[in-house]
């Protein structure tokens, strides 16, 4: 009787839950949010911790900030539509110092969030989980950012990074089927009292990697935890010290779901999509789905997207209609994303650099990164080993190389925050192995600042791919800054849009304006001269002369790549780690400009890339220990590999004696 009386008088306290939003700014298909709601909590606090790492230590330009703020406001409005008492509560303090204080102030029993395998996020989350353990708070973490849990993929791949689509697919098959999407919640619990009876911890604002891009002082932490209006809204661009954004792309779950309905509704487009066949020169509208920034911020679930596309593909297959297959298809693009995420999950911080990266070939690029030997991590600074290369980097980043195709891409990127996948290929190849011979890490940093869809895994992976230091090895296939653009846009409409000083040039000269007679230049209202730093010459607009001879530069780069492949070092090779690699290379890292002939494996030609390389991935040789203890020299790349049905062909190949 006593036992019964005691049992009936005990009322189990209901969970009090913080749902920590991060890169999952959506309500649809959120496994972590479902786990939080399955607790049947008494209160649910949807929280965003304003993280100083991204404010100061990551390169984030104004367009990506605006896109993030759009996504935050959108999901907050969606939360409020379901529960008028709730919203996304943005608290202006990093999670590591803030959450332990919230656990106590709000009487929290559970912390729930979506897993993030980025190197920084892993370290941050480990600290938060330790604090939760000490506070007696249960932590629930669910995978939802990728098709498969990246950590599980790594385990299934033998603890190694996935370096090809095939490896990813094989490992994914071992992990299991891609989970179906979970339903969007129809109700949300009330938040509890928002007591903030503790001091705000001010983060260290130095170093500020974004200081040079700000027009005013950064002030997002100066008005307390709940912001200047005490409304828990996201900081504004003005508070971050930026001018208004210039991107036409608006973020938000509601925005992309409407767009996705249109994409999926066009069954032929969805079912037959092949990335290498889409035009990098298309604009208003672009030729692809432009889902990448929404995937990055989690406004769109990759699993939801994947299954929606698969439904269309299966429907077409049953109807005996044509369909595209990975890796060129829409689902193939999601597989590439998972491949890069799993590669990063395996390697951590070193994935985003050459130094100490066991899967990244070492090439003695110009403008190499400085390294903190105590951590084996790059510092964010680099060595200017050649003043001319420093000028080339700045001209490339600002879109004034004198190659209109390259400049149009870089200007679109800076203005809008997004460019087509093959446009990224063009400018990345040009900066690295196909023109300037500048470290891919410099290009990755510029993209980190400018892209609205920047993800460390995909950005670093793509740059290594295009630099032929990992994932892809056919370095003799280069993107011509002239021929490749002409293939897609012979009239130069894309150039006329983004390089308006050339808009009135005749078609004959639009890709090579320096070849136009001076009278044709003046008639078009432009004069080709200088380096592009001077906008006008009298009444005429100016456009720079080419900053290099592409044909000569390409040959020099290919010779340098050939030497680098022959030496066979990787980022973790002892000679790279101790600096003695210099003994193995000529003073001119990219090799002599003449006197040596022949490409890789005796190849006597180079080729213009056609953009089909992702549908044509040849698995690069894995680094292996040689007798010297360094990574051994891999077998040399060869031509003549059998092309599979899904692979592209060289639409624009040409050969030239070296």
Cite the ranges covered by each PLM segment.
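Active/binding-pocket-proximal capping segment
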Residues: 351, 357-362, 423-472
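Long, charge-rich low-complexity segments
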Residues: 401, 466-511
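Glycine/tryptophan-enriched, flexible segments
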Residues: 159-379, 489, 493, 497-629, ...
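Contiguous, well-ordered alpha-helical segments that form the cores/surfaces of helical PPI scaffolds
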Residues: 289-292, 304, 329, 338, ...
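An acidic- and aromatic-residue-enriched active-site/binding cleft used to recognize and process polar
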Residues: 22-24, 49-51, 93, 116-118, ...
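Glycine-rich phosphate/pyrophosphate-binding loops
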Residues: 37-52, 306, 419, 423-424, ...
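Trp/Phe/Arg-rich N-terminal binding region typifying the photolyase-homology
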Residues: 2-197, 411, 458, 551, ...
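Active-site-adjacent structural elements in folded domains
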Residues: 274-279, 287-289, 376-379, 387-399, ...
